[in-house]
Amino acid sequence: MNFKAFATLTTHHTDPKRLPKDIREALPREALDKKRVYPKDFPKDARDELFARYWVGLEPLRKSGKLGAILLQYPDWFAISRANKEEIVRARELLPDDRLAVEFRNATWMSERNRSETLAFLKEHGLTYVSVDEPQGFPSSIPPIAAVTNDELAIVRFHGRNAENWKKPGLSAAERFDYSYSKKELEEWLPKIREMAEEAREVQLLMNNCYGDKAVNNAAQLAAMLG
């Protein structure tokens, strides 16, 4: 069973009301008046404590052998840099024994110039690169590259190709992912998936085109194609 890391742990904003009371009270007074707080608003110890509590919260699944991977999905403003690499390494240190999978939403990580560096960095720290299929043509678009950086686990997330809705303001997450893959589009991934399966012990294919029954139907189609 996979889990996405809590927003603040991957530099996303969060509503202060969602924080534990003692963590919220540790924030500077000016931060408490905001509707959204970011990691920069937290004392370092408070953010580390959030990581610790997240880790403890997953312990029952960990002990029962039912914890899959923790998804570290970084936002579109999280560009490649030394500081942001250190941020990822810090997450690795604070979640030391878990399988961590990294998904980028900023294209700089997988640009032609930086791609090899990014994949080598993830491999060095035992992190799974999350390959994605998503709308192309946006500054943040990640190319549909299948890559294995951890020989235990590879992941592909299919977000759909609804370019019209992808960045349109005011839409729900489900509306952004409102897309049904054609047979031809799924077939594009078959050789990539088979190659990944030769490099990683486990390959997870996750349909995130979660609008109506589209994810379920496409998952069944892809499973049938793979035999």
Name each region found by the language model.
Residues 2-227:
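Residues lining hydrophobic/aromatic ligand-binding pockets adjacent to catalytic sites
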